[in-house]
Amino acid sequence: MKRVLTALAATLPFAANAADAISGAVERQPTNWQAIIMFLIFVVFTLGITYWASKRVRSRNDYYTAGGNITGFQNGLAIAGDYMSAASFLGISALVFTSGYDGLIYSLGFLVGWPIILFLIAERLRNLGRYTFADVASYRLKQGPIRILSACGSLVVVALYLIAQMVGAGKLIELLFGLNYHIAVVLVGVLMMMYVLFGGMLATTWVQIIKAVLLLFGASFMAFMVMKHVGFSFNNLFSEAMAVHPKGVDIMKPGGLVKDPISALSLGLGLMFGTAGLPHILMRFFTVSDAREARKSVFYATGFMGYFYILTFIIGFGAIMLVGANPEYKDAAGHLIGGNNMAAVHLANAVGGNLFLGFISAVAFATILAVVAGLTLAGASAVSHDLYANVFKKGATEREELRVSKITVLILGVIAIILGVLFENQNIAFMVGLAFAIAASCNFPIILLSMYWSKLTTRGAMMGGWLGLITAVVLMILGPTIWVQILGHEKAIFPYEYPALFSITVAFLGIWFFSATDNSAEGARERELFRAQFIRSQTGFGVEQGRAH
């Protein structure tokens, strides 16, 4: 159990951000009928929304972006719903439960990428793009190579996330509902395909909004009940937690989870720039009507997420007090029933009884569905819009493109289910770290420099992007997580767990060097086109709005 918790602590920063990979062995719980009934209510309601959305999806624009008619407030809630995962809720509260103050550092660390998105990316992305971030990256560069690179970066990130999500979903549902792992994986896969296949972005958006509201309500109620228990005094909360925790006052000391400054910096950069390169997050900015609404989306999303991560800190300390000190929630060996990831779930039972426990369990499942739906749509659009319609079959009709997108949804769903079953007993937490590293090292540098650096050329973007992607993958394989823990070697060739510091540096240097040394006529033409792109990115002139978006 100690080794499982150590692995969780090491991999949680990435896992908690967007994947629901619950690492290590799980203990199957008795069938929770309250949770199953509440979850069925959620499923019926969201399938009703999907049916409603399917009647309104008439074009490619409706399918990919909900017609561009989502408001900034709605999109902010949907982004929060896409970003706040079950592992954010269960994982960070478990981290606070075991390590105290360090959990707050990690939970707030997930917000550091959002100012970059707010100030540098959101408005220009919305003004330049239509459906995917590849629209922006290829605006003045060579369409074919850039779209292939962007689509590959997106698909690798989506695939890694989906596997982690499916395995995490199976284990989590086994924990919370007492359902069989394979049934859980198939259920998530089928529902995910139904949401995206029939409802497109409109259904996905409303599933994410509903999930965000339910999660924020549930976490708020738990935090309120914890604070009520201590007379709404943080001093009492921390004092009581220190009094019952095995580590005592040490739970208030920071710095126990990252081994050295290089690891801390690499982790921070990966979180910060990886967030700004996630395809399913970037895609959400095309669902609003203009750049102003895109900016408002980030403002609202950051507020909702900041509030949520503060709540997880209170929930974690509440669990120390009300769960950790209560033998009712321990097994014969003195360990928490179901493992430390169940700390928040046990707290739900402690503060709200069996009915609220069922509600929180259902919300955790709803959370997974909202995240995988967004991932699937991002992956499908990369194939149908970036590869099929703009590379392999230029001039394809909307109907053909939508057909390819829906076929891709089915293929992604089936692959996700199969891999979820195959990876049942594997350590998949590294996949989330790798996905973040690739988003930070391949997607983010190309998006940023295509919008801000006038001297960028196709050659530089291609060389730097591929170098960043390959470096992230190779260093992750040679690092301690895969080389030692999974492959069983005695010592890692690359000593750090997080490769982002090195792979991001390689990507930016590669883009700069190969662009600066590009003296071709094509490169000169691409540099000249920057001024027109800059004007469009600032003014939005030429951007179709509303349903014509």
Swiss-Prot record:
PROSITE patterns: NA_SOLUT_SYMP_1 (PS00456), NA_SOLUT_SYMP_2 (PS00457), NA_SOLUT_SYMP_3 (PS50283). It is found in: Cell inner membrane. Residues 1-32, 99-102, 169-182, 235-260, 326-358, 425-427, 485-493 are periplasmic. The chain crosses the membrane at residues 33-55, 76-98, 103-125, 146-168, 183-205, 212-234, 261-283, 303-325, 359-381, 402-424, 428-450, 462-484, 494-516. It comes from the Bacteria. Keywords: Cell inner membrane, Cell membrane, Ion transport, Membrane, Sodium, Sodium transport, Symport, Transmembrane, Transmembrane helix, Transport. It is a multi-pass membrane protein. InterPro entries: Cation/Ac_symporter_ActP, Na/Glc_symporter_sf, Na/solute_symporter, Na/solute_symporter_CS, Sodium:Solute_Symporter. Pfam families: SSF (PF00474). GO terms for cellular component: plasma membrane. PANTHER family: CATION_ACETATE SYMPORTER ACTP, SODIUM/PROLINE SYMPORTER-RELATED. Transports acetate. Belongs to the sodium:solute symporter (SSF) (TC 2.A.21) family. This is Cation/acetate symporter ActP.
